[in-house]
Amino acid sequence: MLNGYTILDLSNRVGWLAGRLLADLGADVIRVEAPGVSIAGADWQAYHVNKRLLRLDIQTVDGKRNFDQLIPDVDILIDSAQPGDAFAQHLDWARLKQLNPRLIKVSVTPFGCEGPRAGWLASDIELMAAGGAMSLAGEPDGAPMRVTVPQSYGWAGAQAAVGALTAAVHRTATGIGQHVDV
């Protein structure tokens, strides 16, 4: 389904499933990791199956230059850069669409890229509580309860993949990329 699509995955745990789903649909997903970052964990292996690995230190001048050289050939970029973080400025949508007007950028962060909570960090349990999901677990009249498997990361990743696919349909019709903020 997505044969011929090239995707750069710079996301953290919140967005890992998005890249996995798009890879499962046939896209060429390139996982970008800094040199020295361990890829030995079972969770890393599970979410990055069907992806190629590119070791690139995007915090350095050379790494940023090499990253910029990739963008014109990329269809979708998935990131989890928090607004205000050092590399987030390099991932600025206005700057990236200058490099590739057809690019689809999918940002997967706990509270989005804009608004009063943009830039806030949150764990899965905090996101489940904030979203009301904990009130759905446990006894009918009991206290909210955490579901043991991280739910919010999966929901965010699935929604990011759907957002990327929707933006790809839009791009096919218009020729224009867009920023999807999950």
Summary of predicted features, one role per range:
Residues 1-37:
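Conserved small-residue-rich beta-alpha loop and adjacent elements
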Residues 8, 47-98:
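A structured beta-alpha segment of the ubiquitous adenosine-cofactor-binding alpha/beta core
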Residues 11, 33, 81, 109, ...:
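Nucleotide-sugar donor-binding loop of glycosyltransferases
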Residues 11-14, 59, 109, 153:
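Structured beta->alpha junctions
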Residues 17-21, 41-45, 161:
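Hydrophobic alpha-helical segments in the ANL/AMP-binding
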Residues 21-25, 73, 85-182:
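Active-site-adjacent "lid/gating" segments in soluble enzymes
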Residues 24-57:
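Glycine-rich phosphate-binding loop and adjoining beta1-alpha1-beta2 segment
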Residues 30-32, 54, 78, 104-106, ...:
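Hydrophobic/aromatic beta-strand patches that form the interior of the parallel beta-sheet core
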